[in-house]
Amino acid sequence: MSYSPAPAREAPLRGAQSSDPPAEAAAIAKAADGHFWAEGQVNGSRVRFLVDTGASSVALTPMDAQRLGLNTGRLIYDTPIHTANGDSLAARVRLATVSVAGARMRDVDAVVVGRGLPSSLLGMSYLGRLSRLTATQDTLLLQP
């Protein structure tokens, strides 16, 4: 999993599976730190995500996972991953719902990272289900 900002290009994505009616594209502005941060909802609880197109799946910190009601002590951390802070092990989970900027997806594959992840990541297991993801120098547009 990487922490690099989204590339400045347009990338139409296939496989949007939202149960909600089509919505307008939502804009996420680049933060002062150079990253795109998104306020989302997972299973009805707020989570602040770093948008990471280099992450293959949504990745949760143990603290966020616990706030969502996941029993992190009972998860099986057997999936090796690579983060900017080094190698770690993660536990695979499935999230009932993930919503960001009006785009709600059901049954989203995710991992809970055992250590080394400073913030939860909004990765491709969610982003890849959008109908369109457009990145410019300053803005990320999410089209459900």
Can you say where each PLM-predicted feature lies in the sequence?
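Pepsin/retropepsin-fold aspartyl endopeptidases
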Residues: 1-48, 53-144
